[in-house]
Amino acid sequence: MVSQMFGYIVVNQSEMKFKEYDVYRSYYCGLCQSLKERYGVLGQLSLNYDMTFILMLLTGLYEPEDPFEKHQIRRNLFTDYVADMTVLFACYKAEDDWEDEHSLKGLAYSYLLGKKCRKKPLLYADKVRSISLAMQDFVDAEKQGDADIDTMAQIVSCREDEWKDNLERLGFFLGKFIYLMDAYEDVEQDIKKGTYNPLKKRYEEPGFEEECRQILTMMMSECCKEFEQLPILQNVDILRNILYSGVWCRYEIVREKREKDSVNEVTGNDL
């Protein structure tokens, strides 16, 4: 259950200005273009909004020039880096799909995308190595049935500078939020399938929904605390829209659906 980058870190479009959304989409399109150039159509399949946030975060912090900037597409020196990290995570996700569910689609995607990765120069050898070790440790913990929801961390920082610690802590809590949101959304399905989910043991307990909300809120609170320590001005309103509002959009959809299903089940039993 390697649950990284599933589209939980999104904007709340209803609370954005049209111009802000156009800027957001331009970074998304720039990342899409980079993925296609570097990895082809297979790479484009890994495109997601979570990594678009990372791209905008790094851009806002370091304010690089945009040599490829157009009205609808924005690219800078971080775009290719984020594209490479996107593909790396996609490979792990595909491998995990094969391990968990024997998904032939996951196996094929991992193999084909992995071939493209191996053909490219290894520009981030140390980072790839550290991520690989972290992900393997996590997979090993899952195989042992370790339901400790504090085992997930992710690396967001890309430079050895004064902001490295803040970025790593931000990425740590953001990664845990994504992981727990995925677990929260999939818990019923994972119980039926018998696949690993760190929330399985708690699902039938009283107060499950409230406990999940509290934990998720705590993760995002810590994430936002680290974010606010960064000297970001560029597109800061878009980034705050994501961190303070957008991340809860999917949660509310899942919670409301589960609540509705529960009511329907009770009503059906009463008939």
Tell me what each language-model feature is.
Residues 1-169, 176, 180-209, 213-217, ...:
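Acidic catalytic motifs of isoprenoid enzymes
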Residues 238-244:
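Short, electropositive alpha-helical surface patch
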